[in-house]
């Protein structure tokens, strides 16, 4: 893989467009919200937000991007069920 914000191929991490500290765990496991980022972009540049925004709109389109942002504003209403977590566990074999 490669970093979605700078193209680096080493020290990749799960970069969250909407940071985990800003939301419930819902966004931690949202597959649109999580993309490969290198340590520099994810941590040192605090997500490299401008480049990440351009990536998100380019890959998923403005409608999906806007939906994700809107969900973040109402995240207190979104609480994943245990079955959602179990489905992800099975999918990723963790």
Regions found by a protein language model. Give the residues of each.
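Short flanking/linker segments adjacent to small metal-binding domains or redox-active Cys/His motifs
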Residues: 65-94
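Histidine-centered nuclease catalytic patch
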Residues: 4-34
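Short Cys/His-centered divalent metal-binding micro-motifs
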Residues: 11, 33-60
């Amino acid at each position: 893989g490669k970093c979605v914000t700078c193209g680096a191929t080493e020290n990749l991490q799960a970069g969250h467009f909407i940071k985990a500290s800003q939301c419930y765990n819902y966004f931690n496991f949202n597959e649109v919200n999580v993309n490969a980022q290198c340590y520099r972009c994810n941590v040192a540049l605090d997500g490299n937000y401008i480049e990440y925004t351009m990536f998100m709109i380019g890959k998923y389109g403005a409608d999906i991007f806007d939906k994700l942002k809107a969900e973040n504003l109402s995240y207190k209403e979104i609480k994943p069920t245990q079955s959602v977590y179990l489905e992800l566990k099975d999918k990723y074999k963790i």
